[in-house]
């Protein structure tokens, strides 16, 4: 049943927790008042009591005191009204508010410290369907490699004891009326963890209005976008570096544990303390690092096998008969010009290029392609099991189906409500047909951006052709001989520049389009945004490698009848084949992108941090030790996980889709990821403000993208081996002519047609299976049939084996299934109500828990 949403007055608040005593907590003062830093001392955020809860959230805004009369004063006054209204509504929602100001002659920085009383926490914990513990269990986290090494009796250098290991719990959705059943409910100070408190505070901040909601005047995100507040963040629980004396007496706090045992470079060879990461940063961040560590571990066998295959290629360079024939051919093969203004050339001059091509094009690449296809299938199958185990252990297995609430931005702007069939509650609703129309409109924009990428690719192709002509005319013999490779290498660099520029533009455009599409939940919003950006980035990053792998050298023509693009002759593959050029392109894009990203991740946060400290140095106060909120404000805002996931998924594509051309790709990916894990860990622990802990039950649509890339990789490698490699022509020649491949080089070269020979008064050869008139020879058609048959057999074999592995490996481990049933039984026994089993019956208590004496509040 659909209903139009009633128009609400501006003064409506989420929950009226006001009381005669609330005024004390709401006296946050005027923005004109300021106190010197260091005069007001407040306990650190991790210290709290029932009398004064810990600091749960901090809001910050800056005020310029130099130009009170300026053209932007009207805007400043509007911001002041919005800010005061917002803070008043927070106060009415039950939050306790303190204000601390730091100023100098020029500017003031205002800090709003938010605390949530016990009653507010209980009310919103039930409203958000948060899961809280019923019974503690010993932490049974295990790692398959640790188990294997222990069984073999081999010392495990990856294992390290991390103090204060979080226990596991049986848990269920919180009900205030059944408070006594929950573990630790007798201690109001510790019952809600810091991450749970942050989630509740952020929900309140996201929904609180500061004007008319239908006009979009609600929520902290909009206030940050408008510049009303400059920051909103929960506090870290203390400094990340521990003082030796205090750590021995008091022990390490959670942030210090993560720094000492996870974020330090010296821990590159240790298991990640994922349970500690989850406890401090939430499930979404922990799942990212779990996936990154899992993927990196699986890269190790792929890197070893790929390195062995490459070394085999190095050995074959000096023993391969066709390569030796080419290098020792002297002036036996006079080759046709490679461009309209180029001269004839000797095939023996391309000896180095042919040897380089042999490094990547040999029989071992067929085995490696098959190995990597099955590797990718097994990687995803075992990740599903790992994900299911973590999702259960972290109480988020059914988060998306039952727990996840509509996005605040969606709830405020949706035109009607509808009954949720799972929870039985009325929720904001946006008609699906309207959303589909908007998504189709967004798809048109995506296609336009893809067209821009293709235009850039064509420009790079033309650049390479023109550059090859210019360099080939050089008087320098080295430059003339390497003209095509120099043009290809510089073209790869130009292509990388185009890629990085277009990426920045489209990400901003995709954010606008996805907000316009009105997705109900944050998960749906992120999935839609991710898919848009990935499709664009896929074309952006892979267009050039796809061109080299499957199109370059296919539409060249023959001497006397060459095909052109915009009047410029189409490119040919070099003497070593296009596979070596594809390997070069992959290494330039993949390794170049990794180096640029890692340099950015190291330098940019440092530079931003130094700039923030410099720009706010005069506002930091005169005290030796700044207050916790001042110290955290100097940190960088957390930018989320999207770019981290995108970087890894694009890398996964390079490792799998074109692995037949570059067996060293897994090795470079492994080395990068060892650095990436610690870089990302240091950013979250040391350089970022603490993000709001977000729940998630998996890595979202990224898993489906990885599955699609795995299927695409099988097809791509099959076509690479069949059409871009010399593997099948060599096999065919060894079967039909000479098993030792003597004469294979001459077999692959055609003679120029008589018309071309008479016009130039000189005969020449070119790479093709054509007769003397330029028509395809019977050998070409025979090889074409063999190639197509190879593609069909290869992909059927790999997909069949993958399907069998999918059936043999259960998605959820049996031990997890047993634990889920056990937890279901305990929840039923503890709550003894059918609504606890279903999450909710559809009718919520009319009164907030402030009316319940069991919550410890005055009646």
Swiss-Prot record:
InterPro entries assigned to the protein according to its UniProt record, in alphabetical order: Anoct_dimer, Anoctamin, Anoctamin_TM
Main function: Has calcium-dependent phospholipid scramblase activity; scrambles phosphatidylserine, phosphatidylcholine and galactosylceramide. Does not exhibit calcium-activated chloride channel (CaCC) activity. May play a role in cell-cell interactions.
Keyword Nucleotide-binding: no
Encoding gene, per UniProt annotation: Ano7
Disulfide bonds: none
GO-annotated cellular components: endoplasmic reticulum; nucleus; plasma membrane
Source organism phylogeny: Eukaryota, Metazoa, Chordata, Craniata, Vertebrata
Tissue/organ expression: Highly expressed in the stomach. Expressed at low levels in small intestine and large intestine.
Catalytic activity as recorded in UniProt: a 1,2-diacyl-sn-glycero-3-phospho-L-serine(in) = a 1,2-diacyl-sn-glycero-3-phospho-L-serine(out); a beta-D-galactosyl-(1<->1')-N-acylsphing-4-enine(out) = a beta-D-galactosyl-(1<->1')-N-acylsphing-4-enine(in); a 1,2-diacyl-sn-glycero-3-phosphocholine(in) = a 1,2-diacyl-sn-glycero-3-phosphocholine(out)
Official protein name in the record: Anoctamin-7
Span list, region Disordered: 25-50
Locations listed in the record: Cell membrane; Endoplasmic reticulum
């Amino acid at each position: 049943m659909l209903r139009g949403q009633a128009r609400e007055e501006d003064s409506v608040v989420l929950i009226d927790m006001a009381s005669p005593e609330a005024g004390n907590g709401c006296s946050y003062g005027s923005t004109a008042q300021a106190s010197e830093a260091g005069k007001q001392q407040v306990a650190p955020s991790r210290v709290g009591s029932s009398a004064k809860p810990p600091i749960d959230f901090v809001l910050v805004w800056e005020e310029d005191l130099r130009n009170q009369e300026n053209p932007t004063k009207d805007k400043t006054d509007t911001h002041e009204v919005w800010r005061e209204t917002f803070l008043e509504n927070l106060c009415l929602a039950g939050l306790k508010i303190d204000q601390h100001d730091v100023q100098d002659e020029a500017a003031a920085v205002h800090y709003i410290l938010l605390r949530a009383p016990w009653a507010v926490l209980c009310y919103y914990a039930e409203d958000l369907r948060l899961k809280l513990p019923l019974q503690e269990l010993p932490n049974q986290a295990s790692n398959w490699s640790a188990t294997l090494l222990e069984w073999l009796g081999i010392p495990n250098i990856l294992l390290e004891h991390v103090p204060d290991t979080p226990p596991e719990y049986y848990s269920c959705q919180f009900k205030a009326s059944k408070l006594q059943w929950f573990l630790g409910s007798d201690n109001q100070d510790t019952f809600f963890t810091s991450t749970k408190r942050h989630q509740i505070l952020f929900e309140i901040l996201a929904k609180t209005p500061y004007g008319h909601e239908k006009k979009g005047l609600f929520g902290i995100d909009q206030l940050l976008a408008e510049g009303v507040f400059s920051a909103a963040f929960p506090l870290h629980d203390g400094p990340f570096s521990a003082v030796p004396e205090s750590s021995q007496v008091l022990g390490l706090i959670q942030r210090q544990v993560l720094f000492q045992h996870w974020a330090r470079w010296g821990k590159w060879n240790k298991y990640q303390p994922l349970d500690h990461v989850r406890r401090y940063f939430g499930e979404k961040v922990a799942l990212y690092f779990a996936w990154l560590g899992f993927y990196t571990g699986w890269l190790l066998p792929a890197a070893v096998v790929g390195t062995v295959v490459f070394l085999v290629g190095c050995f074959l360079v000096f023993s391969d008969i066709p390569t030796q024939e080419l290098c020792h051919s002297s002036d036996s093969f006079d080759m046709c010009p490679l461009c309209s203004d180029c001269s004839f050339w000797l095939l023996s001059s391309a000896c180095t290029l042919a040897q380089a091509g042999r490094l990547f094009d040999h029989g071992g690449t067929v085995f490696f392609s098959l190995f990597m296809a099955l590797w990718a299938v097994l990687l995803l199958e075992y990740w599903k099991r790992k994900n299911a185990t973590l999702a259960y252990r972290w109480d988020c297995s059914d988060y998306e189906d039952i727990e996840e609430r509509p996005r605040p931005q969606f709830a405020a702007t949706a035109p009607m409500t509808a009954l949720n069939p799972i929870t039985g509650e009325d929720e904001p609703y946006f008609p699906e047909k309207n959303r589909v129309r908007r998504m189709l409109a967004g798809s048109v924009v995506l296609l336009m951006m893809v067209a821009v990428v293709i235009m850039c690719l064509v420009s790079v192709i033309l650049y390479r052709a023109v550059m090859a002509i210019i360099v080939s005319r050089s008087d320098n013999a080295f430059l003339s001989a390497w003209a095509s490779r120099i043009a290809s290498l510089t073209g790869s660099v130009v292509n990388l520049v185009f890629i990085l520029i277009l990426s920045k533009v489209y990400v901003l455009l995709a954010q606008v389009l996805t907000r316009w599409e009105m997705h109900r939940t944050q998960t749906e919003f992120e999935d839609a945004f991710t898919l848009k950006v990935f499709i664009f980035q896929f074309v952006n990053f892979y267009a050039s490698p796809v061109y080299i792998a499957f199109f370059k050298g296919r539409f060249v023509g023959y001497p006397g009848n060459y095909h052109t693009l915009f009047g410029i002759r189409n490119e040919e593959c070099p003497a070593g084949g296009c596979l070596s050029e594809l390997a070069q392109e992959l290494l330039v894009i993949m390794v170049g992108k990794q180096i640029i990203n890692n340099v950015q991740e190291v330098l940019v946060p440092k530079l931003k941090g130094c700039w923030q400290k410099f720009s706010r140095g005069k506002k930091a106060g005169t005290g030796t030790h700044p207050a916790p909120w001042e110290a955290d404000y100097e940190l960088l805002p957390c930018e989320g996980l999207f770019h981290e996931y995108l970087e890894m998924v694009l890398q996964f594509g390079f490792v799998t889709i074109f692995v037949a051309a570059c067996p060293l790709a897994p090795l470079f990916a492994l080395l990068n990821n060892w650095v990436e894990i610690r870089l990302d860990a240091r950013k979250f622990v040391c350089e970022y403000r603490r993000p709001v802990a977000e729940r998630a039950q998996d890595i979202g649509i990224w898993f489906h993208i990885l599955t699609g890339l795995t299927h695409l990789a099988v097809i791509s490698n099959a076509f690479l081996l069949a059409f871009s490699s010399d593997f099948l022509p060599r096999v065919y020649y060894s079967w039909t002519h000479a098993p030792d491949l003597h004469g294979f080089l001459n077999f692959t070269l055609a003679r120029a047609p008589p018309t071309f020979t008479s016009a130039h008064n000189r005969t020449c050869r070119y790479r093709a299976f054509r007769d003397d008139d330029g028509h395809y020879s019977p050998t070409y058609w025979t090889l074409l049939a063999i190639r197509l048959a190879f593609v069909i057999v290869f992909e059927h074999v790999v997909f069949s084996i993958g399907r069998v592995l999918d059936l043999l490996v259960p998605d959820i481990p049996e031990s997890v299934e047993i634990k889920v049933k056990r937890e279901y039984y305990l929840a039923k026994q503890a709550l003894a109500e059918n609504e606890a089993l279903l999450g909710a019956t559809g009718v919520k208590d009319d009164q907030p828990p402030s009316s319940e004496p069991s919550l410890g509040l005055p009646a």
